[in-house]
Amino acid sequence: MANIEGKRYQDANELVEEQDEPVKLREAAGLAKDTATANFDESIDLDLRLGVDPQHADQMVRGSITLPNGTGREVTVLVLASEGKQQEAEEAGADYVGLDEYIERIEEENWLDFDVAIATPDVMGQVGQLGRILGPRGLMPNPKSGTVTMDVADAIEEIKAGKIEFRVDQSGNLHTPIGKASFSPDELYENAQALLREVIRLRPASAGGLYLRSITLSATMGPPVRVDRSSVLSEAR
């Protein structure tokens, strides 16, 4: 099995190495899809290196966006709310709904069987104690990302439809899945373009010099495909 996987990666790598220079985003989307040769529906990921220093609060790049073609995966949603909002959350399709019992499970059992947590503002006093567990994993409800809200039905609908959160890490890198290998090249391109436009829009005013330092697209088991930065900036206008 290892030899087969190694041969697949080698073939995929040779396909990418044929490109001497970075390619336009649309071509990169097709190449990334072509390099996905594993026996499962690989994720297609967009990786950015940004010219920011996240250790400075005014250079943190974070946000959320609903990808035009969704993410291609089922998203498990936990809603932490008082009883008055729990029925609304259940009817909107939340996978787990409650409050005290889930806070207890997370604290005592380190239970994390969900992708997104939504909380209503009135319970954040209780939910806040989960910050040390959920925060480092990017699961803590946050007003800026729309996951602290009284409009739980709308929030659930957006997340299930393909809303994602993104945040630059301490080294200025941003890694975000933008679809699956089963997507068409056009769908992958549209998702990547939407995310890039949002990241460009969020450029911190204090970030000097080159902002988009590198852009690559890759399948889970495939090599990175380099994307031409100038073409991305041109298309984002």
Swiss-Prot record:
The keyword Zinc does not apply. GO terms for molecular function: rRNA binding; structural constituent of ribosome; tRNA binding. Keywords: Repressor, Ribonucleoprotein, Ribosomal protein, RNA-binding, rRNA-binding, Translation regulation, tRNA-binding. One of its GO terms (biological process) is regulation of translation. InterPro entries: Ribosom_uL1_bac-type (IPR005878), Ribosomal_uL1 (IPR002143), Ribosomal_uL1-like (IPR023674), Ribosomal_uL1/biogenesis (IPR028364), Ribosomal_uL1_3-a/b-sand (IPR016095), Ribosomal_uL1_CS (IPR023673). Signal peptide: none annotated. Gene3D superfamilies: 3.30.190.20, 3.40.50.790. The keyword Thylakoid does not apply. Pfam families: Ribosomal_L1. GO terms for cellular component: large ribosomal subunit. CDD domains: Ribosomal_L1. Belongs to the universal ribosomal protein uL1 family. Part of the 50S ribosomal subunit. PANTHER family: 54S RIBOSOMAL PROTEIN L1, MITOCHONDRIAL (PTHR36427), LARGE RIBOSOMAL SUBUNIT PROTEIN UL1M (PTHR36427:SF3). Binds directly to 23S rRNA. The L1 stalk is quite mobile in the ribosome, and is involved in E site tRNA release. Protein L1 is also a translational repressor protein, it controls the translation of the L11 operon by binding to its mRNA. This is Large ribosomal subunit protein uL1. The lineage of its organism: Bacteria, Pseudomonadati, Rhodothermota, Rhodothermia, Rhodothermales.
